[in-house]
UniProtKB/Swiss-Prot annotation:
Extracellular topological domain: 35-49, 93-133
Organism of provenance: Saccharomyces cerevisiae (strain ATCC 204508 / S288c)
The protein's name in its UniProt record: Uncharacterized membrane protein YDL218W
Membrane disposition: Multi-pass membrane protein
Any one GO cellular component localisation term in the record: cytoplasm
Region entry Disordered, spans: 204-317
Pfam family, one: MARVEL
Ranges of Basic and acidic residues composition bias in the record: 284-295
Keyword terms of this UniProt record: Glycoprotein, Membrane, Transmembrane, Transmembrane helix
Amino acid sequence: MKRVTGVFLTLLRFSQFASSVLVMSLLAYAIHAYGNRGNKKTNFTLATGVISVFYLIALGILCLALPTLIYIGMYFCAELIVCMLWLAAFVVLAKAQGERSCSNTNADGLYYNPYSGQYTADSHRRACNSSQAAIAFSGLCFVLFLISVILLGINVLTPIRKRYQTQGMWRSGASMGTKLHRWSGLALSEPFEETAAYDNTNVRTGDVEAGAGDNAAYTSEPNGDARYATNDPNGQYHTTTTNTRYTTTTADPKTRYTTNDRNPGSANVANSAVDQHAYSTDESGDRSYQEKVTEGAHSGAMSGSTAEPNRNVNQMP
């Protein structure tokens, strides 16, 4: 399919070039046959043909030698200008050469010379027919360039604008990682890769820290039904997270700690299996600390920290 598209675009450019050359050739022959230098209207069409041929030759060289030199903003404007020139040339030439038929004569049997604006005895039949044919080919040039403008907008301008917005209008193909079709310049030979939109419809979310925890796991979790738990190789503790409250139970049933973590900056660490510690908070908000040592002051190691700097410490006998 891409090969068929490339052949079609190449044939389109070749048709534009051939039609432009035909318009120039037909008008040049007509002007020479009439023995005149032409008029402003005819010369305008002739100049349009010259501009078109030069543009197509320059474009072909650039597409072959520098296909990454895109600058779609300038390229699209140039293509559109040539198209509008052919529209104006078609209208002007049809007005100058198409008002009268080549076989029409006046009352004296004289033929009208469109270049001099006078009636002569010479019909200049072949020159007149060449001028009429130039009108048809100038209209064909306009249609062909109109098609190329549309294709350029669809195949090149639109993808670049979708990916790079307005900044892509004035960027080279090398900076965007693409290049033009070598034989036509009407498509990207290396189109941009389409990026699939992110779909999170099957992802369940839950704010565990805010108390809205559920069994849903993130997509990267191998087991979607598993809750997160701490894996302790010695089997000494198991941690469960529920509504920002943390309960830790050691393997020794004699030592248990329960911490209501109201301040994330606090931490409590205990390493003695014989010390018993209790933390409590009364309704007024003041904290009290009680410590009971069952086997002497030096029977175990204990370290604790709290975020309350003004706590009351009472040691039980």
